[in-house]
């Protein structure tokens, strides 16, 4: 079946790109441009619909299978910008027998036709949604095959160890090198360490890929909303001397250097509250803190620390999150009496010190390490690591049959990172999150 979709962003622009893929893509394209197309050449062609009604003049490029993104015949029409002309071309191709592509269907066909593995497919989608320059660089390396090389190398090591083990099982009564199991253990331990390293790096720096989430936490009236407004450089949140003004979370995106960050202003946390609505807001605040990558823990520097301040400090410390302590209202007389390594700011005057502190931390998280770029990859790696750990314990007990069983489990999960077992439901779910023209 031939599929078609808009491959460029929806809306007004200088050009729109319509992508067509399938065994009959070339014939459908000829119906529109009325002249033959040479593969991999950019042709300027007039496009016509039924009854020779002129549609547009476009650049048409034909990619003959298998030398295309999907591995099938692909034709791309670069039309004048705007959605109307592109939709007219799509409508004509639908009339001729194509159908609208499902989200991610072009990439799914590329995967099924061996043009890319799942790691590359996922990295392309993640690169489109990259939240920072650091993330874009990591994902470009992943898309270029560095993660796939790592995974395949790890898989080869496990296969080698499994081959050693099965030799020991099959020829248990024969004279075999005395160090064969010792060598297997050393190889497996090395594989385990490499896998654990990439899992830990990927978990600790996940915000690089997904975008960091920062929660502003504190008791009422310490200036949390004022800090949000100051960072945004406009009045987004209502501020008031009345405690409990913020009842719900407010989320905005702000760019710090090369990083796009989600900042969440939250309701003030206190034990006594005026209504069930405020109580719900406080629970939302605590949940935002638990889900955040970074916490701005805000205090009023012009007042002595209250019991609520101390309780919030204890709550935050138990979360084991990156926390930037903020002493607000630095333009007033300093009275805060807890010793903290904190950033002094006056949200009313200038929040630049806080911006610089956050940007410095974000820059420190940039890495040259290979990273797993999706939750699916992290979970598969975790399961593989768990199986390898079990295998090492069994090897110490000389339980070779069970050791081989755990190795096979590890191999299955490692292999699933680049190419899972045939599971159409899994593939449909994964590719459905892609853009329509991808």
Curated annotation (Swiss-Prot):
InterPro entries: G_TrmE, GTP-bd, GTP-bd_TrmE_N, GTPase_MnmE, MnmE_dom2, MnmE_helical, P-loop_NTPase, Small_GTP-bd. (6S)-5-formyl-5,6,7,8-tetrahydrofolate binds at residues 19, 76, 115, 438. It comes from Campylobacter fetus subsp. fetus (strain 82-40). Its EC number is 3.6.-.-. One of its GO terms (cellular component) is cytosol. Keywords: Cytoplasm, GTP-binding, Hydrolase, Magnesium, Metal-binding, Nucleotide-binding, Potassium, tRNA processing. This is tRNA modification GTPase MnmE. The keyword GTP-binding applies. One of its GO terms (biological process) is tRNA wobble uridine modification. Homodimer. Heterotetramer of two MnmE and two MnmG subunits. Binds 1 potassium ion per subunit. The keyword ATP-binding does not apply. The lineage of its organism: Bacteria, Pseudomonadati, Campylobacterota, Epsilonproteobacteria, Campylobacterales. Exhibits a very high intrinsic GTPase hydrolysis rate. Involved in the addition of a carboxymethylaminomethyl (cmnm) group at the wobble position (U34) of certain tRNAs, forming tRNA-cmnm(5)s(2)U34. GTP binds at residues 221-226, 240-246, 265-268. GO terms for molecular function: GTP binding; GTPase activity; metal ion binding. Its cofactor is K(+). Mg(2+) binds at residues 225, 246. Its main location: cytoplasm. It is found in: Cytoplasm. Belongs to the TRAFAC class TrmE-Era-EngA-EngB-Septin-like GTPase superfamily. TrmE GTPase family. Residues 211-363 form the TrmE-type G domain. The gene is mnmE.
């Amino acid at each position: 079946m031939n599929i078609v979709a808009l491959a460029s962003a929806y809306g007004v622009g200088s050009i729109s790109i319509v992508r067509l893929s399938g065994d009959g893509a070339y014939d459908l394209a000829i119906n529109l441009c009325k002249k033959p197309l040479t593969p991999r050449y950019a042709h300027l062609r007039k496009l016509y619909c039924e009854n020779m009604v002129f549609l547009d003049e476009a650049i048409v490029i034909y990619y003959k299978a298998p030398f295309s993104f999907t591995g099938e015949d692909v034709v791309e029409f670069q039309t004048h910008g705007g959605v109307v002309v592109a939709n007219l071309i799509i409508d004509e191709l639908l009339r001729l027998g194509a159908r609208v592509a499902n989200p991610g269907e072009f990439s799914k066909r590329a995967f099924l036709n061996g043009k890319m593995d799942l790691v590359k497919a996922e990295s392309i989608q993640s690169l489109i949604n990259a939240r920072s320059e650091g993330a874009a660089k990591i994902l470009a390396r992943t898309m270029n095959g560095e993660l796939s090389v790592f995974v395949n190398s790890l898989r080869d090591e496990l296969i080698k160890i499994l081959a050693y083990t099965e030799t020991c099982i099959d020829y248990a009564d024969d004279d075999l090198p005395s160090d064969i199991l010792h060598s297997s253990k050393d190889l497996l331990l090395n594989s385990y360490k490499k896998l654990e390293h990439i899992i830990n790096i990927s978990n600790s720096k996940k915000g690089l890929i997904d975008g960091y989430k920062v929660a502003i936490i504190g008791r009422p009236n310490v200036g949390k909303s004022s800090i949000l407004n100051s960072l945004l450089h406009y009045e987004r949140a209502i501020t008031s001397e009345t405690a409990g003004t913020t009842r719900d979370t407010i989320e905005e995106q702000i760019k710090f250097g090369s990083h796009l960050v989600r900042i969440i202003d939250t309701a003030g946390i206190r034990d006594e509250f005026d209504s069930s609505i405020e109580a719900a807001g406080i629970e939302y605040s605590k949940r935002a803190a638990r889900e955040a990558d970074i916490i701005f823990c805000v205090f009023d520097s012009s007042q002595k620390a209250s019991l609520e301040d101390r309780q919030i400090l204890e709550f935050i410390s138990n979360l084991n999150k990156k926390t930037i302590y903020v002493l607000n209202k630095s333009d007033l007389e300093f009275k805060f009496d807890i010793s903290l390594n904190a950033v002094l700011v006056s949200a009313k005057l200038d929040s630049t010190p806080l911006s610089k502190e956050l940007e410095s931390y974000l820059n420190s998280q940039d890495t040259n390490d290979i990273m797993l770029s999706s939750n699916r990859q992290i979970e598969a790696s975790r399961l593989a690591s768990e199986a390898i750990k079990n295998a090492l314990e069994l090897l110490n007990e000389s339980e070779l049959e069970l050791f081989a069983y755990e190795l096979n489990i590890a191999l299955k999960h490692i292999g699933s990172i680049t190419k899972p077992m045939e599971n159409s439901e899994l593939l449909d779910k994964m590719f459905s999150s892609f853009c329509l023209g991808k």
